[in-house]
Swiss-Prot record:
Signal peptide: none annotated. Pfam families: Memo. It comes from Ignicoccus hospitalis (strain KIN4/I / DSM 18386 / JCM 14125). Transmembrane segments: none annotated. It comes from the Archaea. InterPro entries: MEMO1_fam (IPR002737). This is MEMO1 family protein Igni_0992. Belongs to the MEMO1 family.
Length: 285
């Protein structure tokens, strides 16, 4: 079995398991977080198709990410978590799914849903199997400790990174995921990993982020693409978020729910050049 060692343990989050658990709990209880560690529902109560989560170092974006995980905990453990992130390394094809593997973190190993990966490759003409795109990519890896903290080893993952992030590719990917999961009868949730505007002053970033979040909440992928270009908003993972937007619309939803927005300036205190973060729930209608 292919094993993917952690690429950013010790940088984005602690390499020591006890320290990592403490930082996850700090994220939940932080003033910018939900304010408490969630109780995980012992039974599955699916209330969403997925969530948007940030992917910076935990000390910066952990409290915002915690909002999505707090709400997911209330839904109980899904069978499969499809985690989609942007391709920061430039390696691999346009859309890459990780081959069957175990992803190691300081909290243990997370197994891929091998059957779901196989089915996705069978039904999709946009997804290719590739390891190189995933070897050093942090946007998926940083989600795993939160999932492990909540659900232990009861879930499997389908890790996907997008190098091409247009609305049309996002729609094709959404259709492929939905078809593959329905063919297998999977109970699944989609996590869209993305940060928002990068490296501008706090006030400008908040302004730009709100323009993007308005389109995200209104489930308008094409509108999101337009405002990103028009206002030069450096959101790194619009494609993964568009997948959840299209998926929510497929299920008849009209709006997503903004759970929390903040910037790295809110957590670090340095507001001169910040990155924006949001937690968004894509609810079942």
């Amino acid at each position: 079995m292919l094993v993917r060692p952690p690429a950013v343990a010790g940088t984005f989050y602690p390499a020591d398991a006890e320290e990592l658990i403490r930082l996850i709990e700090w994220s939940f209880t932080h003033p910018l977080g939900p304010g408490e560690v969630p109780e995980v529902s012992p039974v599955r109560r699916k209330a969403s198709v997925g969530y948007m989560v940030p992917h910076a170092g935990y000390i910066y974006s952990g409290p915002v990410a915690a909002w999505s995980y707090y709400h997911l905990a209330q839904e109980g453990a899904p069978e499969t978590v499809v985690i989609i992130g942007p391709n920061h390394t430039g390696l691999g094809p346009a859309v890459s799914v990780m081959p069957p593997s175990i992803w190691e973190t300081p909290l243990g190993g997370v197994k891929t849903d091998d059957e779901a990966i196989s089915e996705l490759l069978k039904v999709s003409n946009v997804v290719e199997e590739d390891y190189s795109a995933h070897a050093y990519e942090h946007s998926l890896e940083v989600q795993l400790p939160f999932l492990q903290y909540l659900f232990g080893d009861s879930f499997r993952i389908v890790p996907i990174v997008m190098k091409v992030q247009t609305p049309s590719v996002a729609r094709l990917l959404m259709q492929s995921i939905k078809e593959a999961m329905e063919n297998l009868g999977r109970d699944y949730v989609v996590l869209s990993s993305s940060d928002l505007n990068h490296y501008e002053p706090h006030d400008i970033t908040v302004e730009k982020d709100m323009l993007a979040l308005e389109k995200i909440v209104n489930l308008d992928p094409e509108g999101l693409q337009e405002v990103l270009v028009k206002y030069d908003i450096s959101m790194c993972g619009p494609g993964p978020v568009m997948v959840n937007m299209y998926l929510d619309k497929e299920y008849g939803a009209e709006r997503a729910i903004l759970l929390k927005h903040a910037t790295s300036g809110d957590t670090s205190g340095d507001k001169s050049a910040v990155v924006g973060y949001a937690a968004v729930k894509f609810p079942l209608p």
